A protein has these predicted regions:
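Structured interaction patches on ligand/partner-binding surfaces of diverse proteins
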Residues: 371-396
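A eukaryotic "domain-start" boundary segment
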Residues: 20-39, 43-47
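Secondary-structure boundary elements
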Residues: 43-47, 51-176, 212, 266
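His-Asp-centered catalytic microenvironments across diverse enzyme cores
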Residues: 160-161, 194, 205-210, 215, ...
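Sec-dependent N-terminal signal peptides
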Residues: 6-9
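Positively charged n-region of N-terminal signal peptides that target proteins for export
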Residues: 1-4
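C-terminal motif of bacterial Sec signal peptides marking the signal peptidase cleavage site
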Residues: 14-15
Length: 396
């Protein structure tokens, strides 16, 4: 009889799925044990797991196991519940999400946060705005193109340095109608995740010439990561910063390119708005950008479609011959309103052969934009033909 009772107890425990309920992989249990041992809300989180529908419970368990301690201690459980429900709904609804490996879905679709922004209820809102727009798409690429193209109009948010803060949440950006490149990237990542497209935040603390930082978005498509940004470039992996990214330095905390991960990686993302923080996990993806730019430059040279354009910045027309006459200035390049590149000109102490150069498409008109010595926006129109070109610009 005792043996029979033990067998019945074991069967009942198996049916219930252990201490956290059915549907949770056995490998998650030690992770949950460790996570819940270190939070005052352990009982509430255990109850949340047991109350979560069985087909959503593994996703909830994964988030609780890996969420930052601060979120585990304070984040709204209703918000966590809604996030999991709509992420799992997207996986059931969209064929591209259903086809994802579990590891990609869990780390690049399911998470409720991108970096260290305020945790708000973005997923349901963005799902309801965007799901009807991608309902007719059969492939991830088409859904990605749709969301990337229409998002600025759908949410009414534009780039503006007057935004309240750098690391804005979607709700904060939509309330103001503006965001920095960081806020725009957070918004695009969340918009893509809302309709089941795997996405993550990427960026660098400083370009190779130290003229500033930048953030953008990576998307997982056809088994590989590619980059885009809030204002959709003409193709994946062809944004205006490609040449700069191609000169990033792997392993250099300031000049490498990192992509964020919700799951711990052993490395961290250098957030310029919170320089002491080590809380956001990341991977160094610099080499992929270097390889992408080298392939682009090699193809352009082989096909003869692009030409090198060098830009020198001098004090004025009377002082434009000696190394000491040169001025270091940030310059952006546009064609038909779309940014094609940017960089910083060589200053007076740099070698005379060190010249800011761009690889630009032939037979096109370009606008070079910079601030002069008086802080005024200056624009220089340059007609690029078939031959390499050196352009001189002046601060006065």
């Amino acid at each position: 009889m005792k043996r029979l009772l033990l067998l019945l107890f074991a069967a009942a425990a198996t049916a219930c799925g252990g201490p956290y309920g059915a549907g949770i992989p056995a490998g998650y249990e030690p992770l949950l044990d460790a996570a819940l041992a270190d939070t005052p809300r352990a009982d509430s989180l255990r109850a949340l797991l047991r109350e979560t529908p069985r087909d959503e419970r593994a996703a909830m368990a994964w988030l609780i196991a890996w969420m930052p301690r601060g979120d585990r201690d304070t984040m709204s459980l209703d918000l966590l519940r809604e996030n999991v429900r709509y992420a799992c709904c997207a996986r059931e609804e969209f064929p591209w999400t259903k086809a994802l490996p579990d590891s990609v879905f869990l780390n690049e679709v399911l998470p409720y946060a991108v970096v260290d922004e305020v945790r708000d209820a973005w997923r349901r809102d963005l799902y309801e705005r965007l799901a009807p727009r991608v309902a007719g798409c059969r492939e991830l690429a088409a859904a990605l193109d749709t969301v990337n193209r229409i998002l600025p109009a759908v949410v009414g948010v534009e780039y503006n340095t007057l935004r309240e803060k750098t690391n804005q949440s979607p709700a904060e950006s939509m309330r103001q109608g503006m965001a920095s490149c960081t806020g725009l990237s957070v918004l695009l990542v969340d918009a893509l995740r809302a309709v089941g497209i795997p996405a993550r935040f990427a960026g660098t603390a400083a370009w190779h010439d130290n003229r500033g930082n930048h953030s953008w978005t990576e998307v997982w498509i056809d088994g590989a990561w590619h980059f885009t940004e809030y204002y959709q470039p003409w193709a994946l992996d062809r944004a205006w910063y490609l040449a700069d990214a191609g000169q990033a330095v792997a392993g250099d905390r300031n000049h490498a390119i990192y992509a964020v991960s919700f799951h711990p990686t052993g490395d961290w993302f250098p957030m310029v708005w919170s320089e002491q923080s080590r809380d956001v996990h990341a991977v160094d993806v610099t080499q992929r950008y270097v390889d992408t730019y080298e392939a682009f430059a090699s193809d352009a040279e082989r096909q003869g479609t692009h030409v090198k354009v060098a830009l020198r910045m001098f004090r004025d027309r009377r002082h434009a011959s000696q190394s000491g006459d040169r001025v270091a200035a940030n310059v952006d390049v546009f064609r038909d309103g779309e940014q094609m590149g940017g960089g910083r000109t060589a200053g007076p102490l740099q070698d005379m052969n060190d010249v800011l150069s761009f690889l630009l498409e032939k037979n096109s008109s370009y606008l070079f934009r910079y601030e002069n010595a008086r802080g005024e926006l200056t624009e220089l129109t340059v007609e690029v033909g078939d031959e390499p070109l050196t352009v001189d610009a002046y601060m006065e």
